[in-house]
Regions:
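Catalytic core of pol beta-like nucleotidyltransferases
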Residues: 1-27, 33-39, 50-96
Length: 96
């Protein structure tokens, strides 16, 4: 199963976990969003902090998502995006 299909199938679980950890407005970017992921690709998620983040944020969210998906996950907070990569990340980003 492609990673993109897995994200679509687990969308509600992913959004629930994000909210539990104080995150929202979840977008996928990188190879998965472009449709050129490989079996060893990680899942790149762009998020906003929408509530009160947990004390281990975003590490706890990453751990929960990796357990759920069985894939490596990278979480990037939108407001923390470096200007060096901002344009390319936002160009790729698509709503979960």
């Amino acid at each position: 199963m492609r990673i993109a299909d897995q994200l679509r199938d687990r969308r509600e679980d992913i959004l629930r976990l994000a909210a539990k950890h104080g995150a929202g407005n979840v977008f996928v970017f990188g190879s998965v969003a472009r449709g050129d992921e490989r079996a060893d690709s990680d899942v790149d998620l762009l998020i906003d902090v929408s509530g009160e983040p947990t004390p281990w944020f975003p590490g706890g969210l990453v751990a929960d998502l990796e357990e759920l998906l069985g894939q490596r996950v990278q979480v990037v907070i939108r407001r923390s995006l470096s200007t060096l990569i901002r344009e390319s990340v936002l160009k790729d980003a698509s709503p979960l």
